[in-house]
């Protein structure tokens, strides 16, 4: 998976135009086409994030959803993440809206949640704690009425190239 972050659609357009007409862009595509086949491309826009945004978070739980009630999802996440039980949440959580390319690897999606951690051990330890909280149980009730999960995967960053942007810039 290649994830490219842009601060705006205008910046994305500028970068793509520059890349498409360059020898570096052609070289990258030549190599990429030998080792990978694109299966999906989509554009997302962050709605809100919780936790501490950090480029050190390289292990992600990526959850694709078909949301029927975005306001309930946002309010439910706000309530859960602001609860006293989750005050020591070690990672970061992002709720994003899928603007284009809503057919994901699993099925149709309107939104995604990304939950980032510095390690899989941190993810595992926090999940064990989270699943025992009242806040999580309440969130499950809201979630079951507001969306269907269409795909879920664990994503581990192999390398991050930050072209004058870091994840913290998108907070």
Give the location of each predicted region:
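Short S/T/G/P-rich N-terminal loop/turn motif that feeds into the first structured element of a domain
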Residues: 1-171
């Amino acid at each position: 998976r290649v994830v490219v972050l842009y601060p705006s659609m205008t910046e994305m357009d500028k970068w793509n135009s520059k890349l498409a007409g360059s020898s570096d862009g052609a070289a990258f595509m030549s190599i990429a086409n030998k080792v990978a086949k694109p299966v999906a491309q989509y554009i997302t826009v962050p709605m809100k994030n919780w936790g501490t945004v950090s480029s050190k978070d390289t292990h992600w739980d990526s959850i694709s959803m078909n949301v029927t009630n975005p306001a309930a999802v946002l309010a439910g996440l706000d309530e859960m993440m602001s609860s006293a039980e989750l005050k020591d949440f070690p990672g970061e959580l992002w709720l994003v809206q899928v603007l284009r390319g809503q057919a994901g690897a699993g099925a149709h999606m309107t939104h995604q949640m990304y939950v980032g951690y510095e390690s899989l051990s941190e993810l595992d330890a926090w999940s064990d704690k989270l699943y025992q909280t009242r806040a999580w149980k309440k969130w499950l009730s809201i979630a079951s009425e507001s969306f269907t999960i269409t795909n879920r995967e664990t994503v581990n960053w192999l390398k991050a190239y930050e072209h004058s942007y870091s994840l913290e810039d998108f907070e």
